[in-house]
Each structure stands twice: as C-alpha cells, then as structure tokens.
C-alpha cells in the first residue's frame, strides 16, 4: 500500500536471506515498525517471543489458536500492542457490529450463521464465524453454540447455529439469518478478492503503530475511524 514499505518477508519457502526474504523471523535483525503474520497459528509463540524481545507491535491474522496460544497473546498484550482479528475485512468488522446490534433488537429471534470457503480451508467453523457468534453472544449471555446439526430434535431459542460449507475456490462468504415469527433479517458479506484482507491488515498496522500496550481488534479500528 502507498506510504508503506515491506522491509522483510519471512517464509521457509524463500531463498535463504536474499532480496529481502528470510527463512526465519529470528534471522532478520533489521529495522521494523510492525510485524504482520498471515502464516499459521502454530507460529504464535515464536512471533510473540520475537516481538516482545524487540518491543515491536504485532498484528496476528491467523485463526485456529489453541487456548494456550490465546493466553500467550493476552499476556503479551500487557507489554506490547497486539492486533488480533480473525478477519481483516472492514466489511466483516461492520457486519460483526451489525450482528450484535440486531441480536440485541430481536432478543427472542432464532439466529443461524452460515459460512462458505474454498475447499482447502482447514479450520471448521471459520474464525470469522466464531467471531460473529461471540459478538452475538455478548448480548445473549446464555447462548449455546451448535456447530452443525447432527442430532434430531427441536431447536431451542438459546442456540446459535453455525454451519460450514467448503466449495471450490470461494474467498469467503458469511451470512447471519435472524428469524422471528413474522420476519427474517439476513446479513451477508462476500469477499470478492483476497487482496482486501491485505489492505485491511495494512490499515490495521497503521492504526497499531504508536499505540500503548493492549489487545486491539477490528472494532477498535472502525470505532476510531468513525470518531475522526
């Protein structure tokens, strides 16, 4: 993005330490303002160690973290600024906010989430679907997540159903269906191009640099944008 410079790219698949490419993060000791990770949640520990040692802001763009990894992220955020989001689309950030508001306005409605991704995606349900569900649950403290439906029986009002489809090369589609006895509200977001996630991450990185230690999300970003 304009006004930004990638000073190092880290991947074990790159040629060893050539042309700004490095095979390991620890091998790079040059200047940087922020670290952005789009790799895999298993790299979380090493990323946190590196950023803590150098007091660098860290932007995490992976999903599927274990409970231990989440605890590590929270502990690191007491020392450095950490931006942690399951999805860096600004549209998804708005959808998350709308989902919470709609759930609060229709407290007795049935709510189901449907997410669709490419057939190579490994985690089920998507991290974004869980973020949406948690946003809804923030105004429904007794909510119960149902991942798919594998048993016979009536649906209870407390349930939030989450359903996953894996098809072709879809970048990502998320739908929230909110149904009362007399109407249905459907909120939908569709990613047309994966570049939007990189654009959103760069915007989040600019937001993060200069912030005090803390754990930041896309909601912090959009609320700051709205306040300006």
Task: Give the ranges of each region predicted by the language model.
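Short, acidic/small-residue loops that bind anionic groups at enzyme active sites
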Residues: 60-62, 84-86, 111-113, 117
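Rossmann-fold NAD(P)-binding glycine/threonine-rich loop
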Residues: 42-54, 61-84, 90-93, 97-102
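Short, surface-exposed loop/turn motifs that are enriched in glycine and acidic residues
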Residues: 84-92, 118-125
């Amino acid at each position: 993005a304009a006004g930004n410079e990638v000073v190092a790219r880290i991947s074990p698949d790159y040629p060893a330490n050539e042309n700004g490419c490095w095979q390991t993060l620890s091998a790079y000791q040059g200047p940087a303002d922020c670290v952005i990770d789009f790799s895999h949640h298993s790299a979380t520990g090493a990323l946190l160690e590196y950023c803590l040692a150098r007091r660098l802001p860290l932007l995490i763009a992976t999903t599927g973290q274990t409970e231990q990894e989440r605890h590590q992220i929270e502990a690191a955020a007491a020392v450095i600024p950490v931006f942690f989001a399951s999805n860096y689309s600004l549209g998804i950030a708005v959808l998350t906010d709308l989902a919470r508001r709609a759930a609060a306005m229709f407290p007795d409605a049935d709510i189901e989430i449907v997410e669709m991704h490419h057939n190579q995606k490994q985690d089920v349900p998507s991290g974004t679907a869980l973020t949406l569900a948690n946003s809804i649950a923030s105004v429904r403290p007794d909510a119960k997540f149902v991942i798919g439906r594998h048993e016979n029986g009536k649906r209870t009002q407390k349930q939030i159903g989450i359903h996953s489809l894996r098809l072709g090369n879809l970048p990502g589609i998320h739908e929230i269906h909110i149904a009362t006895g007399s109407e249905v509200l459907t909120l939908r977001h569709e990613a047309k191009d994966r570049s939007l996630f990189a654009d959103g991450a760069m915007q989040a990185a600019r937001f993060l640099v200069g912030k005090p230690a803390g754990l930041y999300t896309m909601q912090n970003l959009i609320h700051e944008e709205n306040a300006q």
